[in-house]
Regions:
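C-terminal accessory/tail domains of diverse enzymes
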Residues: 1-70, 85, 99, 161, ...
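Metal-dependent DNA replication initiation modules
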Residues: 77, 81, 94-115, 119-122, ...
């Protein structure tokens, strides 16, 4: 998010940020998003989570320096504590203007930011097998990453208010239980053929195949403020996918369990109680987090990312830090202070 350095109000200055980083040798790119007061950072393809850990801070520092040169600041979180997203100008690009025309207020409310992690897949069917295996664990990932308790100047009572706002969109939130990649592909092709979708990128589930990139895209985490946590959650997602591909992360719970867990994780963060991915028990998120970290530990060791996973604290999430603020203005100031290491 792009903020006034003094008031911490959002500022529609994305093109000023883009000009400020133009020509720099960066490990990725800085680009526009729906709102002109927000920018997106994408790393280039990384072979390891350690590469992500180097690339993301470099991208964020470059954007912060470009902002400072304009008398601005940046802040990373899943929502701005007091700005109203409906009041934010839209980037005047055809895809965004069309999107707002299609979705109306449900799109104008999408002043929310998340962390998206792409993991390369061996084949389309492996991608779908991996999706089915990792999906039951994703509400726990939301609980651990929850970072949006404020919205429009109010405490929402949610650890992640981003999650229910995202779910206001069609084809968002919980992924439906297709039986195979081929079944999903046929559904997408039918919706494109009859004019519902332009392509599969108009599907915004918490996890989705991305055939053009050959990846499984996990979109569940709230945007971390601490950039080191971004790399940690990327490492967690990679290790979970690797474990699933090895047959070690089988989740047998039905999709209604996912819906329940998604809401509980959004509401309570790490203090949620969640249905176990195998459907056998109802337990604190902290206990389930310990089980998940143990489950993915062999894959993380093999991938060289064990130290990154150690950054994840199963007993707390960044929403807790925001809740220590006495006002939304104080919360915004804290985000600015913590966003650039």
């Amino acid at each position: 998010m792009i903020l006034d350095a003094e008031t911490h109000e959002q500022v529609a200055a994305v093109h000023r940020i883009l000009r400020g980083v133009e020509g720099l040798a960066l490990p990725g790119r800085v680009k526009t998003e729906l709102f002109a007061s927000v920018f997106e950072t994408n790393t280039f393809v990384c072979a390891t989570a350690a590469e992500v850990d180097a690339a993301l801070p470099a991208l964020r520092r470059a954007a912060a320096e470009a902002a400072a040169a304009e008398g601005l600041a940046i802040a990373a979180a899943a929502t701005h504590p007091f700005a109203r997203p409906e009041a934010q100008p839209i980037v005047k690009e055809e895809r965004y203007v069309t999107f707002v025309g299609y979705g109306g207020i449900s799109v104008r409310r999408q002043g929310v930011q998340g962390l998206h992690v792409h993991v390369g897949m061996p084949s389309p069917e492996d991608c779908w097998r991996c999706l089915d295996a990792v999906a039951p664990w994703l509400p726990l990932v939301l609980a651990l990453s929850a970072n949006s308790p404020w919205f429009g100047g109010e405490l929402t009572g949610m650890a992640s208010n981003r999650a229910p706002i995202l779910a206001e969109l069609p084809r968002a939130g919980t992924p439906p239980p297709f039986r195979s990649y081929g079944e999903w592909e046929a559904w997408v092709e039918r919706l494109v053929r009859i004019g519902v979708l332009e392509d599969y990128t108009r599907i915004w589930w918490d996890v989705r195949p991305h055939p053009a990139l050959g990846t499984l895209e996990v979109r569940m985490p709230d945007q971390p403020t601490d950039v080191r946590l971004s790399a940690a959650f990327a490492a967690l997602v990679q290790a979970l996918c690797a474990t699933a591909l090895d047959g070690g992360a089988r989740g047998g719970s039905p999709r209604p369990d996912y819906v329940q867990n998604r809401w509980s994780a959004a509401r309570f963060g790490v203090r949620a109680k969640l249905i176990h991915p195998d459907g056998s028990s109802f337990l604190p998120a902290t206990e389930l987090a310990a089980e998940l970290l143990e489950l993915v530990a062999p894959a993380a060791a093999r991938l060289g990312s064990a130290k990154l996973l150690a950054r994840i604290d199963p007993s707390g999430c960044e929403a807790d830090m925001q809740l220590e603020a006495a006002s939304p203005q104080e919360a915004a100031a804290g985000l600015v202070a913590r966003s650039v290491a």
